A protein has these predicted regions:
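Iron-associated oxidoreductase/ferritin-like identity signal
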Residues: 1-158
Length: 158
């Protein structure tokens, strides 16, 4: 099915963001793991894997629309040197992602590409949930202090 060129480019922008998220979340997960924050590392790794599933869906959609997925392009990866910096960098990435998703959804609606719209809307819900989680973690750090927050992140939940 030949897709709209603007939608394909928009999907490639989403793909760039998802691939960047995979890398940023993965390195943050590995850093947390190396610092002994296993519980937090597991949660961040889950987010990296979620982004990978999103990237796969976007690639499949681009191919369905007879486009070429651009897997070579990445946004700048922001690596936090401490947990609060990581969470803030990830929050910034999610805010940008939500903006891109909303623009891509609006374009899909405009050109009548309901398949892309539906896929993007489902992904947007996931991105919004991640944003809420990040916001909550940063608020916890603010309220109880980073050392108390990190003490809760040492062991995996049973």
């Amino acid at each position: 099915m030949k897709g709209n060129a603007k939608v394909i480019e928009s999907l490639n922008e989403i793909l760039t963001m998802e691939l960047s998220g995979i890398n940023q979340y993965f390195i943050h997960s590995k850093l947390c793991e190396s610092w002994g924050f296993e519980r937090l590392a597991d949660k961040i790794r889950e987010e990296s894997l979620s982004e990978m599933k999103h990237a796969e869906q976007v690639i499949d959609r681009i191919l369905h629309l007879e486009g070429v997925p651009n897997v070579q392009r990445l946004d700048k990866i922001k690596i936090g040197e401490k947990v609060s910096e990581q969470l803030k960098a990830d929050l910034d990435l999610e805010v940008a992602a939500i903006s891109r998703f909303n623009k891509a959804i609006a374009l899909a609606v405009e050109v009548g590409d309901n398949g892309s719209r539906e896929m993007l809307a489902a992904m947007l819900t996931s991105e919004e949930a991640h944003l809420h989680w990040l916001d909550s973690q940063l608020e916890l750090i603010k309220q109880i202090g980073e050392s108390n927050y990190l003490a809760q992140q040492v062991h995996k939940p049973e």
